[in-house]
Amino acid sequence: MNKQAIDALLQKINDSAINEGNPRTKQIVNRIVRDLFYTIEDLDVQPDEFWTALNYLGDAGRSGELGLLAAGLGFEHFLDLRMDEAEAKAGVEGGTPRTIEGPLYVAGAPVSDGHARLDDGTDPGQTLVMRGRVFGEDGKPLANALVEVWHANHLGNYSYFDKSQPAFNLRRSIRTDAEGKYSFRSVVPVGYSVPPQGQTQLLLDQLGRHGHRPAHIHFFVSAPGFRKLTTQINIDGDPYLWDDFAFATRDGLVPAVRQAEVRKANRTAWTVSSR
């Protein structure tokens, strides 16, 4: 079919609407369908390829991996770059860079003031201590900002999704003090991979790509009257630090990490400072 015939078919489909519907939804869906029709024609996509793709998306949805696919195909990073561009055009600059949320946030984590311990004490990973501070765009510290933190355990698994972990393990919300400061104790997370037999890895194999993520810690930072920040920090030295399958590593999000002796416990702790 030529594009004129395709456009005529699309118009027939659009004309079948029995009421106005939602204009924005119609605009988006019609554009996506048009581009897919063009793709099928241009690449001579066969019926078995089309139905294989459709069934694949159904399987990915049932297994809860659509969020991983969105990250792995670069959609989340693309959305971040678009927001960066919009802010730059509006004259907004500076501050901690944003990066992807990922699909593993869980609302309702316990709230602490100033400091929190994220782990339940059973994880054998190395101790991690992080201290940070939240500032407004004017450079003044923000008191009572909410810092939500979550990360994987020493096996690369997240509580709630990993039923062997207690509820909200390695997940906390911390309110900053009068000087905008917060801190937490946890364990050093490790990098992990998408499920090796899952739908995401199945597609990545077809694309000749890996599904590894470097060790990282997720953050939401919010305060009344300010834009909510969604970001992560990465643990320096991870072999996939700059080869993240989700494209989340960004300059400014790899803080210095150093080892420090914890004398009372006779242990070594990793400390992170984030201004």
UniProtKB/Swiss-Prot annotation:
Cofactor: record remark: Binds 1 Fe(3+) ion per subunit.
Expression triggers: By aniline.
Domain of life: Bacteria
SUPFAM superfamilies documented for this protein: Aromatic compound dioxygenase
UniProt keyword annotation of Iron present: yes
Listed GO biological process terms: beta-ketoadipate pathway; catechol-containing compound catabolic process
Gene Ontology molecular function terms on file: catechol 1,2-dioxygenase activity; ferric iron binding
Cofactor(s), by name: Fe(3+)
InterPro entries tied to this protein: Catechol_dOase_N (IPR007535), Cchol_dOase_prob (IPR012801), Intradiol_dOase_C (IPR000627), Intradiol_dOase_core (IPR015889), Intradiol_RC_Dioxygenase (IPR050770)
Documented EC number(s): 1.13.11.1
Keyword Metal-binding among UniProt keywords: yes
Broad EC category: oxidoreductase
Membrane-crossing residue ranges in chain numbering: none
Annotated positions binding Fe cation: 158, 192, 216, 218
Known pathway: Aromatic compound metabolism; beta-ketoadipate pathway; 5-oxo-4,5-dihydro-2-furylacetate from catechol: step 1/3
Subunit note: Homodimer.
Protein family according to the UniProt entry: Belongs to the intradiol ring-cleavage dioxygenase family.
Name of the protein described by the UniProt record: Catechol 1,2-dioxygenase 2
Gene giving rise to this polypeptide: catA2
